[in-house]
Design a protein with these regions (language model features):
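Surface-exposed, charge/polar-rich loops and edge strands
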Residues: 1-412
């Protein structure tokens, strides 16, 4: 069971929302952020190093100080304004004609500690520490985390009533994705949402494992520092956008490798044939069409690789994943890449970039071979999280990403 509550969001007035809203901090580098950021962009708060010329280290104290200064300035100028009372909010995203409807709310840090907020990825302490600094210095969750939850018809009905009305925000970003936002204003609806979620068994972290872990750690810190702690303080909660799991779609997360580990192309193909049925598909992009099928781009040609029976364990929720099959039978066994987290010989490409990005990086000589995977399903993610298992690195890619700046949660 999960504990949620509404909050008084700090958010842009309607006339500024398109200028303030920005892509998340971790999907663009400093140079891209500097080029993309307009005067009012939230990137000045999430990527404050862009305000220095020349740019400075994003992890330096002057950058952190600038982030705090900018957050205060945005509020002083009226580009961000706090709502007068706590609300829940509906945030909908449209991509390729498909819309998903999330609830912007606060989740409780205790649920992360207890396991009611379920994760499917390991986190790195250095990344957690960096996110903790941002939460501490701002005393706020500037960006939300992305959760899923089991479908609930009553929640869907409440959301449907609000989205039938005029949205508070409604715009299409430069990437072509639509962003729509409503405020749930009726107290009876707010109370009912809180009650319903108290009976929902779990949240699942879709995207934002490091932000979730950092929020939980900051909450624990502030709890220890407060001799009058009651458990009701705002720092016990952190901001999420939670979507029904049936509405979410995971897209492919692909791999490109810099070398063939000393093999020729023919030797690689021969080694692959031990564990896969290998079929040359030609020069046109070839996309895998089912589980346990991979496409490979090598030497200007696409190949289909279908894992042979008996090469993986259908009863192992991790071993049966295509990312595991590829890692075990190809990346480790043939190409000698044993640790995806630390190897400099491999890179990862989100499916949103298209398979043409894979062939481009091989054709230009940057990489030697590319592998495209069939995407993981939400059911696989939920089953693995429920079993307490952890997916291999770079398994899931969710799109569209949450737009930052539509709502901010202050911890006090």
């Amino acid at each position: 069971m999960v504990k949620v509550r509404p909050f008084a969001a700090v958010r842009p007035p309607k006339q500024y929302v398109e200028e303030v809203a920005a892509r998340p901090y971790d999907v663009l580098n400093s140079e891209e952020a500097k080029a993309e950021a307009g005067e009012k962009s939230l990137l000045h708060i999430t990527k404050p190093e862009i305000d220095f010329d020349p740019m400075i280290d994003e992890h330096s104290q002057p950058a952190y100080d600038k982030a705090v200064e900018n957050f205060k300035e945005w509020q002083a100028k009226g580009w961000l304004v706090q709502d007068d009372k706590p609300y829940y909010y509906v945030y909908a995203q449209t991509m390729d004609g498909r819309t998903q409807y999330g609830l912007v709310m606060c989740a409780h840090t205790d649920d992360y500690a207890s396991g009611a907020i379920k994760k499917h990825e390991l986190t790195r302490k250095d990344k957690e520490d960096d996110r903790m600094i941002h939460v501490r210095i701002q005393n706020a969750n500037i960006e939300p985390v992305f959760f899923s939850y089991p479908d609930n018809e009553e929640v869907n009905a409440i959301v449907a009533r609000y989205v039938a009305g005029e949205p508070e925000y409604n715009f299409v970003a430069e990437d072509g994705f639509g962003h729509h936002f409503w405020v749930i204003t009726e107290q009876a609806d707010i109370d009912r949402i809180t009650e319903i979620f108290a009976d929902i068994p779990a949240f699942y972290v879709a995207d934002g494992h490091h932000r979730t872990a950092a929020a939980a750690r900051v909450g624990a810190e502030l709890r220890e520092q407060n001799p009058n702690h009651t458990g009701d303080e705002e720092y016990n909660y952190f901001m999420t956008v939670a979507f029904p799991d049936s509405q979410l779609k995971i897209i492919d997360y692909n791999r490109v490798v810099k070398d063939l580990n000393g093999l020729t192309e023919d030797q690689l193909l021969a080694a692959l044939a031990e564990d896969f049925d290998v079929v040359e598909e030609g020069t046109e992009i070839y996309k895998p069409g089912k589980l346990h099928e991979f496409s490979m781009y090598l030497g200007g040609k696409w190949y289909s690789l279908v894992a042979k029976e008996g090469r993986y364990d259908d009863n192992d929720p991790i071993g049966v994943l295509d990312v595991t099959i590829l890692s075990n039978l190809v990346l480790d066994k043939i190409l000698g890449i044993t640790d995806l987290r630390t190897s400099k010989r491999i890179d990862f490409v989100g499916g949103i970039r298209g398979l043409g990005e894979l062939s481009r990086r091989v054709d230009n000589g940057e990489m030697k071979v590319a592998f495209a995977l069939y995407p993981v399903s939400m059911k696989q993610l939920v089953d693995i999280a429920d079993s307490g298992n952890i997916m291999p690195p770079k398994t899931t890619w969710f799109e569209p990403k949450l737009r930052s700046g539509l709502a901010i949660h202050k911890l006090a």
